[in-house]
Every structure is written in C-alpha cells, then in structure tokens.
Amino acid sequence: MMCGAPSATQPATAETQAIADKVKSQLEEKENKKFPVFKALEFKSQLVAGKNYFIKVQVDEDDFVHIRVFESLPHENKPVALTSYQTNKGRHDELTYF
C-alpha cells in the first residue's frame, strides 16, 4: 500500500468488523439512535500517520452508513475514533474518500 493513497475496496474481515464495533457507540451517539444491525461489508484503508479505514456498514435491511475511522500508530496508545460518516447510503453506493 502506498502512503496516502486509499487501497482498493476489499470485502470486510473480522478485523474490519472489530474496528467498526469499536466506534458503533460513537455513531449511535452522533445520530441519536441505536443500530440493531451493524455489519461491516467492505472497506478501504489509507496509510497516513496511522491508518484511516473507510467502511461500508449495514445498519438495517436496506440502510447503509459509510464510516471513516482513524487508528493511530501503536506507540500513541489511543483508541480508534470515528472521524466522519455518511448516512442514507445504499448497498450499491461506492465507498469513496470523504
């Protein structure tokens, strides 16, 4: 992966789901609602001074959210953080940089 360039879209992994799960409560707080479903479907990553993850998450049968999560470098010992998100996305909406 080249520093600064987002990776190609890939199917979500168990690691991706774990990252999404760590920021679920942050998104629920920002949106003031609970998501009974929170399933990571696909993702891109971007190597910066840490790593950005762009993750497409299914939050209901036909409702999707794109989240951007920042994971700091290991020596910084900081939790992952929800840095941005886009709501009202569909299953076929392309996951892009935002």
Curated annotation (Swiss-Prot):
Similarity comment text for this entry = Belongs to the cystatin family.
Please tell me one Gene Ontology term that the record gives under cellular component.
Answer: cytosol
Q: Signal peptide span per the entry?
A: none
Residue list for modification N-acetylmethionine? M1
Spell out the protein name for this chain: Cystatin-B
Query: What are the alphabetically sorted keywords of the record?
Result: Acetylation, Cytoplasm, Protease inhibitor, Thiol protease inhibitor
* Biological role: This is an intracellular thiol proteinase inhibitor.
A single GO molecular-function term is: cysteine-type endopeptidase inhibitor activity
Annotated site, Reactive site, chain positions: G4
Location of the protein in the cell: Cytoplasm
Q: Which domain of life is it from?
A: Eukaryota
Assembly and partners?
Able to form dimers stabilized by noncovalent forces.
The gene designation is CSTB
Motif Secondary area of contact, per the record, lies over 46-50
